């Protein structure tokens, strides 16, 4: 597919002007005639470029406040005309062939994201002429190049220089695919926006209608292919959202190591999202999507050392996340002590990278700092459908806690309770976390009964010789029976934090009082499946 087409005439009409002046200058310098509209034409003319206004070319003025600019046969005939087949009819109607269309669309997403955006503002930022030209050019990619991304400008000029002012059919086809992806994403944004405004008389509650559109259109971009998926017999790829505003595994830069696997990405996401909950220097070690060790301290080195002590066996081959820069001392401690799949941190010092480079299989990712958590949607695929919910960004403050036991928690117990409550949010349900002095000492994850998660947490602490007496215990959901409290008391837990809300809360609280345990209700559940 190397059939070349020379670029002699280009139509430029862009909302995002980034790079357009330089691109237009490069085209003009190579003898390309420039057509343009409105603000783009004025900008190019101000820079001294020879440009013809589309209204001058068509003989028909822009009208209706710019709503009608390019919807004209001389424009679309020039784009859609098939070279060698429609030449006669084009000549008869004085339609000049347009070999390249450079268009990006009205900023609909940015407009509706603004606080106080009215429906009228949204409507006026629905591009009509732009998508029409994009689709026309993409349809006729055999003869026309359609450019919708400024990131392609340099490559296009380089190819034209290499091919005497022409572009290959391979390139035009690739540009056409990008164009259809672009218009599909654009229309999806509009459909989602209006779909979320469906009123109650269509069957939804006002609350649901304002949050979830009746038809959900999703657009993700493939970042990489995988060797395989969760298991070796499954094929897989990693897709990411455009314009992600929060530091994440999707936006992270891999600075060292071999390609990330499917499971690497899933576990790195779990580790990073957990470590984001802490303001103090923190370390989270994850294995199979569950934290197996978490700690906060005055330095990430000490946080790592304490997190590792929770469960050294499970930490082998795990994922390690930090909320501070990876320094040389911490990197050396990790490399000397254990096998690690991935380390992710906001940044990594040059000295740290020299140390981790000694282990070629260690993947190091930097994700940048995060100023705040960004609300969004979580998805869970079920056979034949998709469950959609808000991200679980909820977290209680100390002021919102309710002490329901006779005994009040000590200051240290309260600190430990809040710490392990944050960790429990990221442990698979049923989740039980034991913590003492800002480090986990036992984690029970994913059990079908809550009491067994509590028992497992105690067993893990005992296996590592960690002192449970005087520790805090967090449960991601309420205790349906007192047996979980009895199990915790048997190993020395002195404070329990849980949502509350069971019909047997009175029995559970009574059990805490019998054992002299301080019990705190959060009134917020954190199931994780």
UniProtKB/Swiss-Prot annotation:
Domain called MGS-like: residue spans: 1-148
Source species taxonomy: Bacteria, Pseudomonadati, Pseudomonadota, Gammaproteobacteria, Enterobacterales
Recorded family membership: Belongs to the PurH family.
Organism for this UniProt entry: Salmonella newport (strain SL254)
UniProt-listed InterPro entries: AICAR_Tfase_dup_dom_sf, Cytidine_deaminase-like, MGS-like_dom, MGS-like_dom_sf, PurH-like
CDD domains, per the entry: IMPCH (cd01421)
Keyword Hydrolase on entry: yes
Domain of life from the UniProt record: Bacteria
Transmembrane segment boundaries: none
Gene behind the chain: purH
HAMAP family named in the record: PurH
Reactions catalysed according to its record: (6R)-10-formyltetrahydrofolate + 5-amino-1-(5-phospho-beta-D-ribosyl)imidazole-4-carboxamide = 5-formamido-1-(5-phospho-D-ribosyl)imidazole-4-carboxamide + (6S)-5,6,7,8-tetrahydrofolate; IMP + H2O = 5-formamido-1-(5-phospho-D-ribosyl)imidazole-4-carboxamide
Pathway: Purine metabolism; IMP biosynthesis via de novo pathway; 5-formamido-1-(5-phospho-D-ribosyl)imidazole-4-carboxamide from 5-amino-1-(5-phospho-D-ribosyl)imidazole-4-carboxamide (10-formyl THF route): step 1/1; Purine metabolism; IMP biosynthesis via de novo pathway; IMP from 5-formamido-1-(5-phospho-D-ribosyl)imidazole-4-carboxamide: step 1/1
GO cellular component: cytosol
Keywords: Hydrolase, Multifunctional enzyme, Purine biosynthesis, Transferase
Any one Gene Ontology molecular-function term assigned to this protein's record: phosphoribosylaminoimidazolecarboxamide formyltransferase activity
Name this protein carries in UniProt: Bifunctional purine biosynthesis protein PurH
NCBIfam families: PRK00881.1, purH
Domain notes: The IMP cyclohydrolase activity resides in the N-terminal region.
EC number per UniProt: 2.1.2.3, 3.5.4.10
PROSITE patterns on file: MGS (PS51855)
GO BP term, pick one: 'de novo' IMP biosynthetic process
